[in-house]
Amino acid sequence: MPEKKQPQIRSGNDPKNAPALRKSERTRQSILDAALEFLWTHPFRELTVGELMSLAGTSRSAFYRYFEDLHDLMEVLLRGVEEDIIEVAGPWLQGEGDPIPLLEETVDGLVRVCYQQGPVLRAVSDAAPMDERLEKAWTDFLKDFDDAATQRIEQHQAVGLIKPFDARPVAMALNRMDAYLMIHHFGRRPRGNRESVRNAMLRVWVSTLYGDEALTRFLSRSKTSTNAKKK
């Protein structure tokens, strides 16, 4: 992969450079925002630099100050989604204590991120079978979460929270379910119901990893919480 071009900005510690830094960041972000908006209604193959920069409201030449090409742009968008997911997945991946509330918190965050950025997942996954570079980006994206989930499952198996089984295939199955469920519901407008997607994911994750008793407790607690909100 070619080395990424970065904005030629001197140290942000110099107050004289602060306006330039802010302007550069705003321009780059406007390009990313325009790409996301385009992807709500179009596949990646229809994206052009000219149309993108028209949507962003800046010159075509400005694009190449921030990105090598459109593939680089998509890789940046996908990395942004990955970073956001890693952040919200922290409770289950790293937290201590009862894993079910930690898993709920993680899934809540995951749904929130993908509800906002679902078109990026759809665009990359749809293009991957016909585009070698995006295929690698998508494969690497999924593998990172397969690795993280496998490690966490094995940690919980080691302390008796999860029964023994081959962790990696199960982690892969759960992650593929998450990815394609959210692509289906959040990859284009109108988007699906966030609560329904969240509940479906939690049912499968809790029952698969922690068993039917844990699922029963989770459903009972969820029902109590729902009833309390209605009062």
Give residue ranges: language-model regions.
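Amphipathic alpha-helical linker/stalk segments
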Residues: 15-18, 41, 77-104, 121-122, ...
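Helix-turn-helix
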Residues: 30, 38-72, 76
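Amphipathic alpha-helical segments used for helix-helix packing
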Residues: 102, 114-133, 150, 180-187, ...
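Hydrophobic alpha-helical connector segments
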Residues: 76, 87-116, 170-174, 198, ...
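N-terminal intrinsically disordered/low-complexity leader segments
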Residues: 1-26, 165, 213-231
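Basic/polar phosphate-binding segments, predominantly the helix-turn-helix DNA-binding elements
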Residues: 9, 13-20, 53-71, 113-116, ...
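Generic hydrophobic, amphipathic alpha-helix propensity
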Residues: 23-35, 52, 77-85, 149
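Amphipathic alpha-helical packing segments from all-alpha helical-bundle domains
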Residues: 83-86, 113-116, 132-158, 168-172, ...
